[in-house]
């Protein structure tokens, strides 16, 4: 009979099989009431599942991350329960958990309107408030199939036929008259599922295949309590205000259009930000001793076959042909960098060789996945590849890590989560090589005092990698930086160097990206700063304005002086009220507005005002220029007098 070991090391002995709920009841009624599921020997199970042998057990409640995921998954079933009551002929497809919520794909003979979604949410609340028990039954494959055939659930039948073995016992979850199929676990009672909201609907092909029927996908969010739900909805509201697509239009940064899906039309001000970002990255490339190169954006398909990209990536590659040869527009820069490395004999004395490129890449992303600057088809990578010996890996990774944090800190990103992905089952190279490589990455992180978590088995077949995920002011995660070891590509493309022993050796290649896609990073920055870019990045840093025509000459002189000092400046001499001009440029998020009236002309000064509405008073022109230059040069996130 089972001995149950709890997380604190204490044990409970039973003379019969017990469920996590039984153990929770044994500990106390308060814990039992809070119990959502259990983790038995590291595996999540339903609160009602029986434990027959000795096991470790952790009780899962709404305070646990897994508990929240289970609540969300059960809310997807609740959605199914409600939609079948409102529209009984609906066919249910799949309803998984996603970030912050859930969705359900449904086959419905009507297009859901906003009023329909509101009615659906209302019915979900009515059902949840009944606090009914969710009943789990493990049944044979044949019984499960018969259940869903009788109910006309063709998609569930297809899942059974195509994805579930005949000797398996699927779990059927009964929500009163509604039945759904799932691995689980799910909440034992609907009292855990009171805090949710349906968010939107979208189209989705069955199994993600455009040859299949288009279904309707209903998205929802769910949380453990009302406070968390409201906080999330508030964050969404703030995120909507910061949406880079909206701000990009307001500030005239860029646009997209149907004739070039996923391709960016940069306007002058947006391109100014792009170029300033390039200047910043180039300064870091120089500091960390990289050489900058430029490869062709299109190469023969034969090369992509050698690299393995054609076999594994061809659906995402744009192709063209000329003179009976097929070419691929590059989706990444690494093969081109190996070609540059291969020009001329390389010695161990030439290593490490650090090669960087602002590489223009194209990937044939599905049109439905495109999203402003965040998901595009044409993008520029701040890409680099380091060719080195195995002995140099640790030092090079160390330098990459320092560079990542150096660059992120410039933008004020302080919360960075780091993950180290280790060897997968299918891989090249010896265990000894992987041992050394993984240890080198781990030690490099430790030497920089960076906490990290392992992602076991998540590395590429050709080497382990470090991923850097930064969190913005709304606590949203953006995976941008990567340091990836590659023991395969140099060999595939015949890269070599002459070692100290005069023998030919294959270099190790380190793929290194920090910002990732420049376009996406500008989208992230736009939302992080809500368009209030730090002065060094702002397209227009200063606007000089007159109050009446009599100050026009002074404004022009001052504008020229600022321009000569390397400051991006515009003069606004329009015959408009000064309040109107200030408001307009404030809405344009121009960092500084310099106002010139008769008093300023007479004193050779200028009245300085920030876009946040702070009046810095009347200041000496040369002092203002000097302070602005210092702010821009230091890439400060703070404005004058902040």
Curated annotation (Swiss-Prot):
Annotated region described as Catalytic, given as residue ranges: 243-534
Regions crossing the membrane: none
Cross-referenced SMART domains: tRNA_SAD
UniProt cofactor note: Binds 1 zinc ion per subunit.
InterPro entries xref list: aa-tRNA-synt_IIb, aa-tRNA-synth_II, aa-tRNA-synth_II/BPL/LPL, Anticodon-bd, Anticodon-bd_dom_sf, Beta-grasp_dom_sf, TGS, TGS-like
Zinc is among the record's keywords: yes
Protein name: Threonine--tRNA ligase
Species name: Salmonella choleraesuis (strain SC-B67)
């Amino acid at each position: 009979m089972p001995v149950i070991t709890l997380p604190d090391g204490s044990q409970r002995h039973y003379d019969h099989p017990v469920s996590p709920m039984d153990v929770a009841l044994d500990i106390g009624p308060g814990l039992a009431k809070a119990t959502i599921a259990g983790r038995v020997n590291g595996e999540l199970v339903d609160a009602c599942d029986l434990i027959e042998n000795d096991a470790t057990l952790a009780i899962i409640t709404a305070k646990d991350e897994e508990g929240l995921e289970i609540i969300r998954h059960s809310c997807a079933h609740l959605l199914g329960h409600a939609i079948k009551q409102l529209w009984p002929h609906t066919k249910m497809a799949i309803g998984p958990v996603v970030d912050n919520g859930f969705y359900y794909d449904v086959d419905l003979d009507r297009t859901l309107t906003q009023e329909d979604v509101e009615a659906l949410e209302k019915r979900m609340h009515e059902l949840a408030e009944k606090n009914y028990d969710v009943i789990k039954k493990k049944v044979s494959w044949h019984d499960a199939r018969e259940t869903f055939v009788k109910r006309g659930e063709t998609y569930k039948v297809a899942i059974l036929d195509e994805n579930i073995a005949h000797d398996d016992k699927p779990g059927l979850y009964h929500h009163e008259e509604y039945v759904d199929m799932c691995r689980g676990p799910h909440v034992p009672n609907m009292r855990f599922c009171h805090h949710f909201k349906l968010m939107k609907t979208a189209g989705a092909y069955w199994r993600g295949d455009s040859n299949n029927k288009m279904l309707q996908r209903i998205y929802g969010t769910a949380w453990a309590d009302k406070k968390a739900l409201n906080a999330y909805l508030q964050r969404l509201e703030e995120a909507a205000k910061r949406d880079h697509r909206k701000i990009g239009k307001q500030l005239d940064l860029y646009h997209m259009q149907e004739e070039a899906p996923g391709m960016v039309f940069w306007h002058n001000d947006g391109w100014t930000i792009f170029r300033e970002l390039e200047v910043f990255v180039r300064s870091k490339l120089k500091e960390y001793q990289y050489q900058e190169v430029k490869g062709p954006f299109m190469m023969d398909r034969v090369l992509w076959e050698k690299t393995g990209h054609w076999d594994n990536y061809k659906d995402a590659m744009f192709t063209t042909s000329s003179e009976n040869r097929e070419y691929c527009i590059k989706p990444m820069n690494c093969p081109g960098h190996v070609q540059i490395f291969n020009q001329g004999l390389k010695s161990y004395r030439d290593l490490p060789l650090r090669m960087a490129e602002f590489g223009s890449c194209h990937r044939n992303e599905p049109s439905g996945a495109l999203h402003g600057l965040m998901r595009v088809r044409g993008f520029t990578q701040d890409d680099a590849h380091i060719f080195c010996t195995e002995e140099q890996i640790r030092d090079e990774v160390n330098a990459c890590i320092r560079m990542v944090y150096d660059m992120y800190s410039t933008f004020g990103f302080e919360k960075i989560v780091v993950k180290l992905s280790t060897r997968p089952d299918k891989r090249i190279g010896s265990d000894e090589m992987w041992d050394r490589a993984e240890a080198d990455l781990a030690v490099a992180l430790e030497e920089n005092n960076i906490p990290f978590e392992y992602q076991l088995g998540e590395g590429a077949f050709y080497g382990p990698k470090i991923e850097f995920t930064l969190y913005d002011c709304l606590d949203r995660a953006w995976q941008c930086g990567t340091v990836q070891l590659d023991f395969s590509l140099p060999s595939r493309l015949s890269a070599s160097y002459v070692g100290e022993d005069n023998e030919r050796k294959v270099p190790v290649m380190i793929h290194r990206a920090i910002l990732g896609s420049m376009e996406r990073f500008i989208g992230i920055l736009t939302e992080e700063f809500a368009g209030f870019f730090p002065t060094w990045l702002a397209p227009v840093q200063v606007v000089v304005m007159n109050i009446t025509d009599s100050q026009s000459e002074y404004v022009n002189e001052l504008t020229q002086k600022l321009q000569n000092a390397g400051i991006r400046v515009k003069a606004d001499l329009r015959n408009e009220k000064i309040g109107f001009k200030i408001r307009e440029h404030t809405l344009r998020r121009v960092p500084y507005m310099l106002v010139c009236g008769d008093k300023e002309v007479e004193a050779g000064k200028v009245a300085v005002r920030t876009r946040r509405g702070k009046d810095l008073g009347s200041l000496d022109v040369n002092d203002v220029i000097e302070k602005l230059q210092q702010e821009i040069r230091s890439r400060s996130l703070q404005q004058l007098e902040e």
